């Protein structure tokens, strides 16, 4: 009888959780999951709040700014609404025909091309803001305009991407490029005339694979044995799938240039 009462008391202690019927480990897992998802969403749909030129590039940008004659009368072209800061840090004007680098910084298309040609045009440039190597220039303006300036800018961007988009990338550089590439990949995925269907199917299969792995009881690190630590392999698998999607998107851009 005493043994039975002890077991009942032990069960009561085990059930003493913050929310009745839900273990504390599950609550911690949910909170951590939501925090990671919120961080990823913030990284995907936000950019650096401070668009300050890196000290090592200030002199080059100053000279280039004088050459570009920053007094521009032409209005800025149409832009995507999810950008909150539409000012080019090179010319200090509202970004015209904006282009985003793989590191997530926005510039006028003509400004970043001039920055490339004024500097070492034989090699990939370093971002004027964060000094990360720029291997992709992603246009954020519409392609309906077929004016001479827009066509010329598209040719310059394609020329740059054709030269440097296939450069080897370290795992850390791929992680740093992840928010920007995923944002553009998912935007094209849900737009008419964006990504071709085979690539969309591959993205859907990756997302479905991540979902089924999350709900599957078969894990590399079982939650039943390791508790909250058992969720680490789930996040790791999802993280690898996101990196794989960004690599696929980079390959799609390279294939477009070689057509």
From Swiss-Prot:
<keyword id="KW-0833">Ubl conjugation pathway</keyword>
<dbReference type="Pfam" id="PF06803">
    <property type="entry name" value="DUF1232"/>
</dbReference>
<dbReference type="InterPro" id="IPR027370">
    <property type="entry name" value="Znf-RING_euk"/>
</dbReference>
<feature type="transmembrane region" description="Helical">
    <location>
        <begin position="225"/>
        <end position="245"/>
    </location>
</feature>
<keyword id="KW-0256">Endoplasmic reticulum</keyword>
<keyword id="KW-0472">Membrane</keyword>
<dbReference type="InterPro" id="IPR001841">
    <property type="entry name" value="Znf_RING"/>
</dbReference>
<feature type="topological domain" description="Cytoplasmic">
    <location>
        <begin position="246"/>
        <end position="259"/>
    </location>
</feature>
<protein>
    <recommendedName>
        <fullName>E3 ubiquitin-protein ligase RNF170</fullName>
        <ecNumber>2.3.2.27</ecNumber>
    </recommendedName>
</protein>
<feature type="transmembrane region" description="Helical">
    <location>
        <begin position="203"/>
        <end position="223"/>
    </location>
</feature>
<dbReference type="GO" id="GO:0016567">
    <property type="term" value="P:protein ubiquitination"/>
</dbReference>
<keyword id="KW-0479">Metal-binding</keyword>
<comment type="function">
    <text>E3 ubiquitin-protein ligase. Plays an essential role in stimulus-induced inositol 1,4,5-trisphosphate receptor type 1 (ITPR1) ubiquitination and degradation via the endoplasmic reticulum-associated degradation (ERAD) pathway. Also involved in ITPR1 turnover in resting cells. Selectively inhibits the TLR3-triggered innate immune response by promoting the 'Lys-48'-linked polyubiquitination and degradation of TLR3.</text>
</comment>
<keyword id="KW-0808">Transferase</keyword>
<dbReference type="InterPro" id="IPR013083">
    <property type="entry name" value="Znf_RING/FYVE/PHD"/>
</dbReference>
<keyword id="KW-0812">Transmembrane</keyword>
<dbReference type="InterPro" id="IPR017907">
    <property type="entry name" value="Znf_RING_CS"/>
</dbReference>
<feature type="zinc finger region" description="RING-type">
    <location>
        <begin position="88"/>
        <end position="131"/>
    </location>
</feature>
<comment type="pathway">
    <text>Protein modification; protein ubiquitination.</text>
</comment>
<dbReference type="GO" id="GO:0061630">
    <property type="term" value="F:ubiquitin protein ligase activity"/>
</dbReference>
<keyword id="KW-0863">Zinc-finger</keyword>
<keyword id="KW-0862">Zinc</keyword>
<comment type="subunit">
    <text>Constitutively associated with the ERLIN1/ERLIN 2 complex. Interacts with activated ITPR1.</text>
</comment>
<dbReference type="InterPro" id="IPR010652">
    <property type="entry name" value="DUF1232"/>
</dbReference>
<feature type="topological domain" description="Lumenal">
    <location>
        <position position="224"/>
    </location>
</feature>
<feature type="topological domain" description="Cytoplasmic">
    <location>
        <begin position="47"/>
        <end position="202"/>
    </location>
</feature>
<dbReference type="InterPro" id="IPR038896">
    <property type="entry name" value="RNF170"/>
</dbReference>
<feature type="topological domain" description="Lumenal">
    <location>
        <begin position="1"/>
        <end position="25"/>
    </location>
</feature>
<keyword id="KW-1133">Transmembrane helix</keyword>
<dbReference type="GO" id="GO:0005789">
    <property type="term" value="C:endoplasmic reticulum membrane"/>
</dbReference>
<dbReference type="GO" id="GO:0008270">
    <property type="term" value="F:zinc ion binding"/>
</dbReference>
<feature type="transmembrane region" description="Helical">
    <location>
        <begin position="26"/>
        <end position="46"/>
    </location>
</feature>
<dbReference type="Pfam" id="PF13445">
    <property type="entry name" value="zf-RING_UBOX"/>
</dbReference>
């Amino acid at each position: 009888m005493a043994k039975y009462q002890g077991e009942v008391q032990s069960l009561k202690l085990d059930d003493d959780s913050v929310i009745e019927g839900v273990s504390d480990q599950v609550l911690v897992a949910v909170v951590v999951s939501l925090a990671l998802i919120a961080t990823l969403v913030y990284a995907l749909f936000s950019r650096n709040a401070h668009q300050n030129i890196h000290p090592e590039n200030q002199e080059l940008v100053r000279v280039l700014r004088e050459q570009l004659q920053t007094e521009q009368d032409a209005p800025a072209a149409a832009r995507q609404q999810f950008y909150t800061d539409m000012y080019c840090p090179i010319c200090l004007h509202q970004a015209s025909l904006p282009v985003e680098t793989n590191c997530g910084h926005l510039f006028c298309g003509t400004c970043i091309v001039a920055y490339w040609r004024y500097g070492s045009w034989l090699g990939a440039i370093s971002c004027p803001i964060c000094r990360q190597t720029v291997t992709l220039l992603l246009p954020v303006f519409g392609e309906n305009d077929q004016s001479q300036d827009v066509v010329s800018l598209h040719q310059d961007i394609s020329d740059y991407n054709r030269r440097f988009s296939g450069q080897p990338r370290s795992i850390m550089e791929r992680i740093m490029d992840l928010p920007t590439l995923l944002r553009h990949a998912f935007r094209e995925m849900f737009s008419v005339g964006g990504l071709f269907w085979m690539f969309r199917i591959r993205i859907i299969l990756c997302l479905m694979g991540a979902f089924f792995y999350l709900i599957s009881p078969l894990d590399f690190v079982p939650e039943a044995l390791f508790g909250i630590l058992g969720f680490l392999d789930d996040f790791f698998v999802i993280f690898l799938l996101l990196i794989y999607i960004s690599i696929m998107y980079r390959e799609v851009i390279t294939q477009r240039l070689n057509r």
